[in-house]
Regions:
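Short, contiguous alpha-helical
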Residues: 1-46, 89-127
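Acidic/histidine-rich alpha-helical segments that form the ligand environment
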Residues: 47-88
Length: 127
């Protein structure tokens, strides 16, 4: 898809869809005040490589179905957070252990991550 990311558009869409449940679980943990210490950049790279290997042949239909389902479930989960939960902070290992809020996790991981890949998909498709 790009010079640095060789995954197909379909695989990227499936990847984004697959990450929503994980990102929501992290936001829920932070919202409950629990430190998230087991997520490292090495673990992210390993997860991404495993996903690419296991789902290299995903079809457009299955990738879009997963995206629709998981994004709807993620949206419902985000809407269920209270203001207090969104404001709660706890240490997060991807931020070098700095305390971050659940809102930050939602905005920086679920939303920014999707937006980042959408930009790459658009470039690949010439849009």
């Amino acid at each position: 898809m790009s010079d640095t990311d060789r995954r197909s558009v379909g695989l990227i869409v499936h990847h984004v869809a697959s990450m929503y449940p994980i990102e929501i679980d992290v936001a829920r943990a932070i919202a409950s005040g629990k430190a998230v210490t087991d997520v490292t950049w090495d673990a992210v790279a390993e997860l991404n490589a495993k996903h690419a290997q296991e789902h290299a042949e995903e079809t457009k239909t299955t990738a879009l179905e997963l995206l629709r389902r998981n994004s709807r479930e993620a949206s419902n989960a985000v809407c269920a957070f209270t203001d207090e939960q969104l404001d709660r902070a706890a240490p997060f290992s991807l931020s070098f252990g700095a305390p971050v809020t659940a809102q930050f996790i939602i905005e920086d991981h679920a939303l920014r991550h999707s937006w980042h890949h959408l930009a790459g998909v658009r470039r690949a498709l010439g849009r």
